[in-house]
């Protein structure tokens, strides 16, 4: 009986770990007020606008773990792609886009 309980507990913990999502996954309110969804896509995370003028457009791909991510971010209005990064802290996501890693612009998104 005890062995069955221990085995069931171990299986539950392993299942929870396997299904744990990275902190970046979810819906975020952008600085412009649009909703962006960040979801797993292959070995990275895709950033797609869910609402607003550019709804449905993929605007980024980031890779990383544990709250720090790097990749590419696209400004849909200018149709330009930049080196990007994201850092999750609680319900905030600090997104940054850089040109040649010298000229950078950042904004904070809020988890919905």
Label the predicted regions.
Residues 18, 36, 45, 93, ...:
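A broad, low-specificity signal marking well-ordered, structured residues that form hydrophobic/aromatic
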Residues 14-21:
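Sec/Tat signal peptide C-region and signal peptidase I cleavage site
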Residues 22-85:
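Central antiparallel beta-sheet cores of small beta-barrel/beta-sandwich binding domains
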Residues 85-108:
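Short, exposed beta-strand-loop hairpins at the edges of beta-sheets
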Residues 111-112:
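Short, solvent-exposed mixed-charge patches
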Residues 9-11, 67, 77, 81, ...:
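Long, low-complexity, intrinsically disordered polar/charged segments
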Residues 4-14:
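Sec-dependent N-terminal signal peptides
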């Amino acid at each position: 009986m005890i062995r069955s309980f221990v085995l069931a507990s171990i299986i539950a913990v392993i299942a929870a770990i396997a299904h744990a999502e990275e902190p970046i996954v979810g819906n975020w309110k952008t600085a412009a007020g649009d909703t962006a969804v960040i979801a797993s896509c292959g070995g990275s995370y895709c950033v797609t606008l869910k609402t607003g003028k550019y709804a449905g457009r993929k605007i980024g791909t980031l890779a990383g773990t544990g709250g720090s991510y790097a990749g590419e971010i696209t400004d849909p209005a200018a149709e330009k792609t930049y080196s990007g990064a994201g850092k999750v802290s609680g319900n905030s996501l600090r997104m940054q886009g850089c040109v040649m890693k010298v000229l950078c612009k950042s904004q904070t998104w809020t988890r919905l």
